């Protein structure tokens, strides 16, 4: 009997202790902490995820601006670090919680050529074009023209990156067979200076920090990319000048190249679905508050955005199309 009472007493003490610990560990909403019941968004508040770029890149800063400006009682935006345009598309298609993605505009052409079974044009639409990024191709002094790179090592950046995607399309389109390498840009720059590779490709808005510290003593120069009819289907013409890179481009010259657009893409949901309505609400909020993104506190690339810009080969998200039709005067 005493043993039974002892066991009961022990169990009682143990349960009391566990209950006390649970209460002590439970978040107290009155002190500003969230309980399980309050962690969920309030009814009617849409939560959307945007997959962007690397932690130090422009894409994630653009996504963070959207999260800051549009956050409110009806909308919350989660900006997520991404791993390049190709992976961002895969995340948009298959990763739970990803409603939109910032990608390069040539990603559709890349998938058509290399993953034709995906038929992305039927699955992905664009809310708006954001801004242009320039294709930089820097080489050693031994390389005079783009054609001279045939058979030589050219760094395409890491696999799956936007640069790798654009470089692959460019050399394929121009029918110049090079030997791609896939080092990160910092490593590739050291190998370029050491003569281990002949050129380095990089897609980024000019001027980019990767080239700003180069000097004449490094014996490197930009290669010109001629804007051929085949490139016109996917890219825009662009130039690099002494104003962009004073140590690499003579004051009286310009280097011709191409530019690729950064795009805010969304899955092409059925217009009657709840997922479509969520993205449609975001689109309306983005467009209505667009002038706030052009303020000095936001990334300067916002001032290059035209909501009405058309992207060849892409289908505009229906809610964006409807908003533009009802707003004749567009920024």
Question: Residue ranges of each PLM-predicted region?
Answer:
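Extracytoplasmic
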Residues: 45, 57, 74, 84-87, ...
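Pocket-flanking alpha-helical
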Residues: 63, 67-68, 79-119, 189-191, ...
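Bacterial N-terminal signal peptides that target proteins for export
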Residues: 1-13
């Amino acid at each position: 009997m005493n043993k039974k009472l002892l066991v009961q007493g022990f169990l009682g003490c143990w349960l009391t202790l566990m209950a006390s610990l649970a209460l002590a560990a439970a978040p107290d909403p009155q002190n500003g902490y969230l309980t399980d019941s309050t962690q969920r968004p309030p009814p009617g508040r849409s939560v959307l995820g945007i997959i962007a770029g690397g932690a130090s890149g422009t894409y994630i800063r653009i996504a963070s601006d959207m999260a800051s400006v549009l956050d409110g009682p009806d909308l919350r935006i989660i900006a997520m670090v991404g791993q390049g345009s190709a992976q961002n598309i895969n995340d948009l298609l298959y990763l739970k919680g990803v409603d939109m993605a910032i990608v390069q505009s040539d990603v559709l052409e890349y998938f058509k050529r290399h993953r034709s079974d995906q038929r992305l044009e039927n699955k992905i639409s664009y809310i708006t074009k954001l801004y242009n990024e320039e294709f930089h191709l820097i080489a050693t002094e031994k390389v005079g023209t783009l054609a001279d790179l045939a058979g030589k090592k050219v760094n395409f950046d890491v696999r799956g990156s936007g640069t790798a995607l654009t470089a692959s399309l460019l050399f394929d389109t121009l029918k110049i067979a090079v030997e791609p390498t896939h080092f990160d840009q910092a490593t590739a720059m050291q190998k370029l200076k050491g003569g281990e590779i002949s050129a380095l490709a990089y897609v980024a808005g000019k001027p980019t920090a990767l080239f700003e510290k180069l000097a004449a003593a490094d014996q490197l120069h930009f290669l010109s990319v001629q804007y051929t009819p085949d490139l016109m289907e996917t890219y825009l013409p662009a130039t690099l000048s002494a104003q962009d890179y004073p140590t690499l481009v003579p004051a009286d010259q310009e280097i011709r190249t191409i530019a690729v657009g950064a795009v805010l893409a969304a899955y092409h949901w059925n217009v009657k679905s709840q997922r479509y309505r969520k993205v449609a609400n975001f689109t309306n909020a983005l467009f209505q508050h667009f002038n706030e993104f052009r303020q000095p506190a936001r990334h300067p690339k916002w001032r290059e955005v035209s909501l009405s810009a058309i992207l060849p080969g892409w289908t505009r998200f229906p809610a964006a199309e409807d908003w533009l039709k009802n707003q004749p005067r567009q920024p």
